[in-house]
Regions:
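Catalytic cores and adjacent flexible loops of soluble metabolic enzymes
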Residues: 1-252
Length: 252
């Protein structure tokens, strides 16, 4: 999967780090989570493969123990998922870690975001290493719930980098987010339906919003085109226009 993500143009691959017993209580959910829980040795194997493929390894920390494990493994970029936006102990540890931190903001309102960001700032978060991620925690997320314009608000109010965590069925929002100045776009990735048969699809909510390698690569290519299309903001005659200059109308 890591090699395929590299082929598809991803700059990094992100996993999920959690301890099931600290994260969930209903036993039916816990059984599902244990199927995907990664041990410390699993993390080391994945990190080695990422190094081999020359792609950045990062992970989402769902609890304090997992966050400290990632720090001990010298993971430099750690995401705090939306469900932990209210975990002030974890946010404080993240702010004090010196790591690059992505903070996702699904299932929150404006006051929640302000409280969390200001708490991290108060505990020494280097805002040059901080990315505030717009996210709508719906699988799939309907277009009217994406709310890309909040990215402008985030960057203006908090003076930080912004990113977009995409759960939409179409890659349109991910591509459009470039126009709002994102430095990070996160999108779920799968190899295909092969291997999902051991799970109940009802238990894998991200499958409908995940892209396999070739569609993912198309999305990345279009994102790169969108980045080039933004331009400088200064109006000038581009060299691409020069062959047409002699055709300009002249009126007296």
């Amino acid at each position: 999967m890591i090699a395929k993500a590299k082929f598809a143009g991803a700059d990094a691959v992100k996993f999920q780090s959690y301890r099931t017993d600290q994260l969930v209580h209903p036993e039916d959910i816990a059984d599902f989570c244990r199927k995907s829980e990664l041990s410390e040795d699993d993390h080391r194997i994945l990190m080695a493969e990422c190094e081999e493929q020359d792609i950045e390894f990062m992970s989402s920390a769902f609890d304090l123990e997992s966050f400290y494990m990632l720090c001990e493994l010298d993971v430099q970029t750690i995401k705090i998922p939306s469900g932990q936006l209210f975990n002030h102990v974890l946010l404080r540890a993240a702010a004090e870690s010196g790591r690059t931190i992505y903070l996702s903001t699904g299932m929150s309102d404006w006051s929640d975001v302000v409280t969390s960001v200001e708490l991290m700032r108060a505990h020494g978060m280097d805002m040059d290493k901080f990315v505030l991620m717009q996210c709508t925690s719906a699988y799939p997320c309907p277009p009217e719930a994406v709310n890309l314009r909040v990215l402008d608000t985030y960057s203006k109010v908090f003076k930080c980098r912004v990113g977009y965590s995409d759960h939409a069925e179409s890659p349109a929002a991910a591509i459009l987010s470039v126009a709002f100045g994102v430095s990070v776009i996160e999108h779920h990735f799968i190899l295909g339906s092969v291997g999902l048969e051991k799970y109940d699809i009802a238990e894998t909510p991200d499958e409908p919003v995940s892209l396999p390698p070739f569609p993912f690569k198309v999305m990345v290519d279009r994102i790169r085109q969108a980045e080039k299309s933004l331009g400088s903001g200064i109006k000038f005659v581009h060299e691409a226009e020069e062959p047409m200059l002699h055709r300009r109308d002249v009126q007296l």
